[in-house]
């Protein structure tokens, strides 16, 4: 057989079942092309409405394998998320179909066991933002390890652009362009619906009381709630400028960790916590350096002694160990074993939860999942006081883990607080330094509190995860399991149920509509259906031997497509849409977010409408910026930026504006950094001149440079987005494949808006809580507020913010050490008028620590870096 590698197929961020949004990753080399001649490449930006109905007369792909091994593996792993076919007693093919475009899989049917005439009748409504000549339907036979390609059907995108539905029986062709078996056909239908025909995206993100939120998700939109938005772990009164909202209200800056500590103290029934890391010695309240406030561990022990059910679900780092009194911290330094030991003889129940692979996964796939990926959700659920002496559920969701290194304020000190509020809480894993010398790594993050019906969905997520994690495994399965750790709220009359939980009605101008989203699969939760045919009704996607909830990605795509004025993003990572890069297209970083933003801007340019996107990321991912993994991530980040800017430049050329405007008039990337002159707070409240207690020869080179320059990046750990000052999305998910795929890191997020503070409701710019939050973040980053900042889509605002960030970068990079009133830095790359992204002259590497800013293509495990 002649093999002609024409495309790699990797799972994109598309749909499955009847879900509108969501996808997963899968790599596969399809070694043939079923068409002859070249076809025109078309940009498909909109949705593909697809039905994969049935196949007939498929060949028996299993006969050879079972003859070869004597059927020794027959039945092993064949019943996991599969449907029995018409030949359940016969050994034959276990077919399923993948749908792909630009080498990225956008849909997958469930597997039907032992069938040469499978019937799926499976619907996909898939968002696409791909340039391609063909859509591929690949029919495969699922094996115990991997799969075999039976054949493929190709639909030219040029035909789809006519807008007509293409449907019928299509021959399944092999590598020679011939039927894989006489009479073998696939019944399907497909229609392309371009963005301009989709009314869902034309009214803004939160267009009023009748909005249904993100359709086709596991958790629906919940109405009648309240939300508190947080920036950083703490904001001292009077440290940020006032922001005035509609109705004469002044925006109130929340104090996240103090609110969480207060919620713990006031809990009467339950405290449930999930985290990537939870560290018991952390102090949530640090006013006046008061040691009587107690640690997190002490607070939880006290509450458990009062009869409150305290459950803590933490990721079990596979590199940390505790055996016979000896322990290792682990590569990620999450302190999981230390936290478990602290609570061991208390009534606080701590469950260390490994990231398990799916039941039907191969040994290699399981090993990858269990060693590379994590449980990354950060939530706290408590009962709180409600009306009429009853209790209700309140949930905290966001990017802040309750562990060391996370407590910070908008001032983001480097040295001054090492002996006060950051005493015993020093964190800087970027190079070798100490709490005596510094600098600490400043930490910027976003978090939220949900009061209302959506909090019960956060509770449901915890319960589903706890039930799965507490299920006995290995030899423990021989014992009877009766874990009753979770409270049955339906048996506690004083706790309101979901139907009673609305904390505000739609007539209240301060009410919220809130929706909970996740990235998670059936290997991490209990409660997903066993039968994949039932996944459709639960808005779950079908992977191979696994069901997937990918609603965080769906929420991002929905919000970006609905944006009318601007997008503001803060995220720890920003990479994706590799299918549209100029190289490395088959990497598998297939989330749509970067391409959707670029196409949103391009469409606004063609319509000659105002629009801007502001994206804040860390200067570099946490760790040594010279290391191979971080250089590789920075390389992918550079490829993502390049793709976006070139897409925008092409739109400017198309409308003849390339001589007047440039891509950075619409899209800008920023990072955060700060400097301090040589002073430090001391415990008695005074400030003294600070000199390192040790001589420079005793310090490493990076530490010497950092102490001399007295500067460091502010680490952006945020995972949030504001759209048009009317919609906010905050959670634990990064903008990369790990967080958005659903089968890698487990994540959770909330999306919300105030229906009375929307463009549709007001007919003008909303000035509700989300407007106040965005302005407060800008005040933190820029050091002050100007009137131009109220309208981010205006060119005057874009250029003013860029100008200030460039001035801040020059101050950050200068030899002279000066206090920085603002922290927002222009990301240190050069973007020319044609959209080419290159090194900034004179700043090819990061100050002090080195490492190429645009990254390097160094050898490292791919799935670690995307």
Curated annotation (Swiss-Prot):
Q: How is its activity regulated?
A: Inhibited by neomycin.
Could you tell me which InterPro entries the record lists for this protein? C2_dom, C2_domain_sf, PLipase_D/transphosphatidylase, PLipase_D_C, PLipase_D_fam, PLipase_D_pln
Where along this sequence does the record place binding of a 1,2-diacyl-sn-glycero-3-phosphate?
Answer: 376, 572, 717
- The keyword Phosphoprotein belongs to this UniProt entry's keyword annotation: yes
Regarding tissue, the record states: Highly expressed in inflorescences and old leaves, moderately in stems, roots, siliques and young leaves and low in flowers.
Q: Spell out which residues are annotated as carrying Phosphoserine.
A: 692
Main location group? cytoplasm
Where does the UniProt annotation locate this protein? Answer: Cytoplasm; Membrane
**SMART domains, per this entry?**
C2, PLDc
EC number assigned by the record: 3.1.4.4
Keywords for this protein: Calcium, Cytoplasm, Hydrolase, Lipid degradation, Lipid metabolism, Membrane, Metal-binding, Phosphoprotein, Repeat
Q: Which GO terms describe its cellular component?
A: cytoplasm; membrane
What processes in GO biological process is this protein linked to?
Answer: lipid catabolic process; phosphatidylcholine metabolic process
User: Which GO terms of the molecular function aspect are on file?
Assistant: calcium ion binding; phospholipase D activity
Its membrane topology: Peripheral membrane protein
Q: Which residues bind Ca(2+)?
A: 232, 412, 444, 780
Q: Which residues form the active site?
A: 376, 378, 383, 717, 719, 724
Pfam families the record matches: C2, PLD_C, PLDc
The domain comment in this protein's record states: C2 domain is a calcium-binding fold, and the binding promotes the protein association with membranes. In PLD gamma, all the calcium-coordinating acidic amino acids are conserved.
Designated name of the protein: Phospholipase D gamma 3
Q: Could you tell me which species this protein originates from?
A: Arabidopsis thaliana (Mouse-ear cress)
């Amino acid at each position: 057989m002649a093999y002609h590698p024409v495309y790699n197929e990797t799972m994109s961020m598309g749909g499955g079942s009847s879900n509108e949004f969501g996808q997963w990753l899968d790599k596969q080399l399809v070694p043939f092309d079923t068409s002859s001649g070249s076809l025109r490449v078309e940009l498909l930006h909109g949705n593909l409405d697809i039905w994969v109905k049935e196949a007939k007369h498929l060949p028996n792909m299993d006969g050879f394998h079972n003859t070869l091994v004597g059927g020794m593996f027959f039945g092993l792993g064949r019943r996991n998320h599969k449907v029995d076919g018409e030949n359940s007693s016969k050994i034959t093919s276990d077919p399923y179909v993948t749908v792909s475009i630009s080498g990225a899989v956008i849909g997958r049917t469930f597997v039907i066991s032992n069938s040469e005439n499978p019937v799926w009748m499976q619907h996909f409504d898939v968002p696409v933002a791909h340039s391609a000549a063909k859509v591929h339907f690949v029919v495969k036979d699922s094996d115990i390890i991997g799969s075999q390609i039976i054949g493929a059907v190709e639909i030219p995108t040029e035909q789809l652009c006519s807008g007509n539905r293409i449907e019928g029986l299509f021959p399944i062709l092999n590598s020679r362009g011939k039927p894989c078996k006489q009479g073998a056909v696939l019944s399907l239908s497909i229609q392309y619906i371009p963005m301009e025909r989709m009314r869902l995206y034309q009214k803004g993100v939160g267009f009023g009381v009748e909005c249904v939120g993100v359709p086709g998700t596991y958790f629906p939109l919940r109405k009648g709630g309240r939300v508190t938005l947080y920036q950083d772990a703490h904001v001292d009164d009077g440290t940020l400028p006032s922001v005035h909202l509609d109705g004469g209200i002044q925006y109130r800056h929340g104090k996240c960790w103090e609110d969480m500590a207060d919620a713990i103290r006031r809990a009467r029934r339950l405290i449930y916590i999930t985290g990537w890391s939870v560290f018991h010695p952390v102090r949530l309240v640090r006013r006046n350096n008061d040691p009587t406030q107690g640690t997190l561990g002490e607070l939880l022990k006290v509450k458990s002694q009062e009869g409150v059910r305290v459950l803590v679900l933490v990721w079990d780092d596979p590199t940390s160990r505790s055996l016979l009194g000896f322990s290792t911290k682990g590569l990620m330094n999450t302190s999981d074993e230390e936290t478990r030991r602290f609570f061991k003889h208390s009534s606080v129940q701590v469950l260390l939860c490994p990231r398990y692979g799916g039941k039907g996964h191969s040994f290699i796939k399981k090993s990858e999942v269990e060693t590379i990926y994590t449980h990354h959700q950060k939530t706290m659920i408590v009962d709180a006081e409600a009306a009429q002496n009853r209790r209700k559920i309140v949930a905290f969701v966001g990017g802040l883990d309750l562990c060391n290194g996370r407590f910070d304020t908008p001032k983001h000190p480097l040295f001054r607080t090492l002996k006060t509020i950051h005493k015993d809480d020093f964190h800087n894993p970027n190079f070798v330094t100490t709490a005596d010398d510094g600098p600490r790594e400043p930490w910027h993050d976003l978090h939220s509190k949900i009061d209302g019906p959506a909090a019960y969905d956060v509770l449901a997520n915890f319960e589903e995860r706890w039930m799965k994690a507490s299920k006995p495994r290995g030899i423990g399965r021989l014992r009877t399991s009766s874990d009753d750790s979770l409270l049955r709220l339906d048996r506690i009359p004083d706790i309101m149920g979901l139907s009673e939980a609305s904390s505000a009605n739609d007539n209240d101008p301060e009410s919220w509509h809130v929706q909970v989203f996740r990235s998670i699969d059936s290997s991490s939760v209990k409660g997903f259906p066993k039968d994949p045919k039932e996944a459709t009704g639960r808005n779950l996607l079908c992977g191979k031997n696994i069901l997937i909830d990918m609603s965080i990605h769906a929420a991002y795509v929905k919000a970006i497509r609905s944006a009318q004025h601007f997008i503001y993003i803060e995220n720890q990572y920003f990479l994706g849409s590799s299918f549209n890069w100029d190289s490395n297209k088959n990497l598998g970083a297939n989330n749509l977010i970067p391409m959707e933003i670029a196409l949103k801007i391009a469409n606004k340019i063609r319509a000659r409408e105002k629009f801007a996107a502001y994206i804040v990321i860390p200067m570099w991912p946490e760790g040594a910026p010279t290391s191979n993994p971080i250089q590789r991530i920075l390389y992918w980040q550079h490829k993502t930026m390049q793709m976006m800017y070139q897409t925008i430049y092409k739109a400017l050329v198309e409308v003849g504006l390339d001589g007047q405007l440039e891509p950075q008039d619409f899209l800008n990337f920023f990072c955060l950094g700060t400097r301090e002159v040589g002073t430090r707070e001391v415990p008695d409240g005074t400030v003294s001149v600070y000199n390192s207690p040790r001589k420079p020869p005793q310090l490493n080179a990076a530490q010497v440079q950092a102490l001399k320059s007295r500067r460091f990046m502010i680490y952006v750990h945020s995972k949030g987005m504001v759209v048009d000052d009317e919609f906010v999305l905050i959670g634990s998910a990064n903008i990369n494949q790990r967080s958005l795929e659903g089968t890698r890191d487990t994540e959770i997020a909330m999306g919300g808006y105030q229906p009375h503070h929307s463009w549709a409701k007001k007919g003008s710019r909303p000035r509700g809580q989300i407007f106040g939050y965005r302005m407060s973040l800008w005040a933190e980053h820029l050091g002050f507020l100007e009137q131009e900042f109220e309208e981010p889509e205006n060119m005057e605002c874009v250029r003013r913010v860029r100008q200030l960030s460039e001035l801040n970068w020059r101050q950050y990079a200068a030899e002279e050490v000066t206090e920085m009133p603002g922290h927002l830095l222009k990301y240190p790359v050069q973007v020319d008028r044609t959209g080419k992204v290159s090194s900034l002259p004179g700043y090819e590497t990061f100050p002090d620590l080195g490492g190429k800013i645009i990254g390097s293509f160094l050898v490292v495990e791919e799935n670690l870096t995307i």
